[in-house]
């Protein structure tokens, strides 16, 4: 089976590795162009590019996949299937119709829930207890094609988006191989999605991580877990931005304003929320490394009564 693989971030590495390991004929890899990153703005390769080069695969990094010259290249490769995993560009109808077996996508949710760019993060932020991966035939819509295989997992109570991503990446790689084997044998029939059950997982931005202390402790803790490792949940302490890496919930209701520091112990910083108390266990001030509260308090102080999220703390 001649495969063209299209993918870009870390999540797309394991499926490509699995294709190579299972001796699929990967005739070309398409990934996003190198982008400037970091303070020095040096061009950085995508994780998929690095794997493709390590295995000597033919590599393409078109700025626009829809350009006629790129479409002609894809046609000339005569793919049996195009596999797409978090590529970052939309495939035109013309491209979708090129492969013999169509274009197959690995999506990190139980479709039709959480269509879109950030299904892993949004599932945790929304407090979902389970998620998974879905393989599907691609059509011109956004994650709207007929579903092929679904694999479900439970989301751990303390699991972060980064940890869940790693689990779903491995599950996606395994599910992709099973999907391709069944598609090639003709034993797999696509199932249409129910649009009435669909939801959309919008792309993340830095502002998403700002904590609203009027929300419940549970909602804030879900935000913290769902934004690790990026964009990170944050608040301010006396005007200084603080990222929060770890927290737990205390159910006891006490008086105070949302965002108010109720008490400070080595085990954590107790903060009043709209419902319940959030205990912050690991923090990171701007320009500093993450520290457990116990470590931070060894050389610093946190004042009781300060309102988090207020520029002056009052």
From Swiss-Prot:
Homology family: Belongs to the Fmt family.
Catalytic activity: L-methionyl-tRNA(fMet) + (6R)-10-formyltetrahydrofolate = N-formyl-L-methionyl-tRNA(fMet) + (6S)-5,6,7,8-tetrahydrofolate + H(+)
InterPro entries xrefs: Fmt, Formyl_trans_C, Formyl_trans_C_sf, Formyl_transf_N, Formyl_transf_N_sf, Formyl_transferase-like_C_sf, GART_AS, Met-tRNA-FMT_C
Keyword line: Protein biosynthesis, Transferase
Function statement: Attaches a formyl group to the free amino group of methionyl-tRNA(fMet). The formyl group appears to play a dual role in the initiator identity of N-formylmethionyl-tRNA by promoting its recognition by IF2 and preventing the misappropriation of this tRNA by the elongation apparatus.
Molecular function via GO: methionyl-tRNA formyltransferase activity
Record-linked CDD domains: FMT_core_Met-tRNA-FMT_N, Met_tRNA_FMT_C
UniProt-annotated binding residues for (6S)-5,6,7,8-tetrahydrofolate: 109-112
Transferase among keywords: yes
Gene Ontology CC terms, in alphabetical order: cytosol
Superkingdom of the organism of origin: Bacteria
Enzyme Commission (EC) number: 2.1.2.9
Name of this protein: Methionyl-tRNA formyltransferase
